[in-house]
């Protein structure tokens, strides 16, 4: 039988985990009515059998990490931007540490449109920490039920009445006792570097063996959080990544920090949305007025394995003896960078799909000419066909796509028609299934006053719960006494 010491050493003192069988992202980013958010659990475990943890504070932060590499810019070709989008004090109360309300002098922390603001007092749960430090005889594991739904019904106004965005969520858990109450909040501020916690106040530290702290970070309705993205095209690299960082402050020792990557997706650019499947008609006359071209684009959003298709109609206007030489269809990728040393944006473009049809100087009669052009996406004729991006916009860069139709004529000016098109990372079959899931989620949010996802309990094993020198071990991530 494995000894308890061996079992304990397999655990990290601080871990961030998603809910069982789920991802960190709940709801659908880009669809505000689905109440998108990040949910999970921060687990704290003591690795010493006879020494509980002397905790001062546990915080959780959501970071966005952007990076851009532009080879042709020389020594200043690399740009990066790291931002803390949200900071939540999980333990103890946020109000017991007012210094955390002071923004640090650090450019990495910025109050941007993506920052998740602190909830109004009227929507804040009460949380009591005095019970964690009491020496009264209590059960070895304390559970605090979460009884308040995380967001109010969508039809209710913001309780704060403020013009500044306030997330419609009640933070995370509710604990009620006869003691005084304080607020738990989310703030875009945080301590950048680990510090030595040297407080001698006995009420500022809490001796515990283990804790399970559920968290829930809502996404703002009035801001766009881009998808996780990474693209390397001909040496030009742009990426957006996210990670959760948990910091545990202990008495007299450096902070312990753990990070976990988080993959975020947006669902407002699915190719199955009806707004992207209405035909778009474009009419253009050649610069000499001799030919009229009409183009019909059946769908304005494409995904992997989709067929990019257009219908082209060419009619003579006031010319004769006009011949059509070639029709072509192209999809061009535009990567736009915002560089501090450049007065204008830097644009890199590359064709990612091309289809040509030679008509061998076909005569344009009075009845005109109609053709259909189509090709699967991505185009396997390109060497980097396996490198596919999608439409996205971030702080340092944006990736957009343009559909280009060219008509090459003889005895008339050539015509070129361009129209923006959205490229989605999701296949159309999967997109349709996601629409059904989104609809179900939105109905759940409306009917359950927020579609509660986080139903976990706060679980705390305090040092005072072991009156004797009992040994303990972990079983299925729960601490248990050994007989």
Swiss-Prot record:
UniProt xrefs under SMART domains: Arrestin_C
Keyword Cytoplasm appears in the UniProt entry: yes
Subcellular locations according to the entry: Cytoplasm
Domain of life: Eukaryota
Gene Ontology CC annotation, any one: cell division site
Principal cellular location given in the protein's record: cytoplasm
Keywords, alphabetical: Cytoplasm
GO biological process: division septum assembly; mitotic division septum assembly
Low complexity composition-biased segments: 171-187
Region described as Disordered: 134-197
Biological role stated in the UniProt entry: Involved in cytokinesis.
Family: Belongs to the arrestin family.
Protein name as it appears in the record: Arrestin family protein 1
């Amino acid at each position: 039988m494995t000894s308890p010491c061996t079992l304990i050493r397999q655990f990290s003192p601080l871990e961030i985990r998603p809910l069982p069988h789920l991802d960190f992202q709940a709801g659908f980013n880009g669809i505000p009515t689905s109440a998108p958010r990040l949910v999970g659990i921060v687990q704290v475990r003591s690795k010493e059998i006879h020494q509980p943890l002397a905790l001062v504070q546990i915080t959780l932060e959501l970071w966005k990490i952007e990076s851009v590499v532009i080879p042709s810019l020389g020594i200043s070709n690399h740009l990066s931007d790291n931002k803390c989008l949200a900071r939540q004090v999980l333990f103890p109360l946020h109000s017991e540490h007012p210094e955390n309300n002071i923004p640090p002098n650090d450019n990495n922390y910025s109050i941007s449109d993506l920052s998740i603001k602190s909830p109004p007092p009227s929507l804040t749960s009460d949380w009591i920490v005095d019970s964690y430090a009491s020496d009264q005889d209590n059960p070895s594991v304390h559970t605090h039920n979460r009884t308040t739904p995380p967001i109010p019904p969508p039809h209710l106004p913001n309780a704060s009445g403020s013009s500044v965005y306030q997330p419609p969520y009640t933070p995370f858990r509710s604990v009620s006792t006869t003691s005084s109450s304080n607020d738990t909040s989310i703030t875009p501020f945080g301590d950048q570097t680990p510090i030595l916690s040297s407080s001698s106040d006995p009420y500022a530290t809490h001796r515990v063996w283990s804790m399970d702290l559920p968290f829930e970070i809502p996404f703002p309705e009035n801001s766009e959080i881009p998808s996780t993205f990474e693209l390397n095209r001909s040496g030009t690299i742009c990426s957006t990544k996210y990670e959760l960082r948990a910091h545990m402050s202990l008495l007299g020792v450096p902070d312990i920090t753990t990070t976990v990557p988080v993959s975020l997706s947006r669902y407002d650019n699915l190719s199955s949305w009806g707004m992207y499947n209405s035909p778009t008609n474009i009419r253009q006359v050649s610069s000499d007025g001799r030919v009229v071209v009409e183009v019909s684009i059946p769908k304005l959003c494409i995904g992997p394995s989709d067929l990019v298709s257009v219908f082209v109609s060419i009619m003579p206007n006031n010319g004769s003896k006009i011949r059509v030489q070639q029709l072509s269809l192209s999809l061009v990728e535009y990567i736009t960078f915002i560089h501090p040393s450049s007065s204008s944006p830097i644009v890199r473009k590359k064709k990612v799909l091309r289809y040509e049809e030679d008509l061998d100087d076909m005569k344009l009669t009075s009845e005109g000419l109609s053709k259909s052009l189509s090709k699967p996406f991505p185009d396997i004729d390109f060497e980097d066909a396996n490198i596919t991006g999608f439409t996205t916009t971030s702080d340092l860069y944006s990736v957009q796509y343009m559909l280009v139709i060219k008509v090459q004529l003889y005895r008339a000016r050539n015509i070129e028609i361009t129209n923006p098109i959205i490229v989605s990372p999701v296949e159309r079959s999967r997109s349709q299934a996601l629409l059904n899931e989104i609809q179900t989620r939105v109905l759940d949010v409306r009917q359950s006053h927020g579609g509660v996802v986080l139903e976990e309990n706060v679980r705390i094993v305090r040092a005072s719960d072991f009156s004797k020198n009992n040994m303990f071990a972990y079983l299925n991530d729960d601490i248990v006494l050994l007989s």
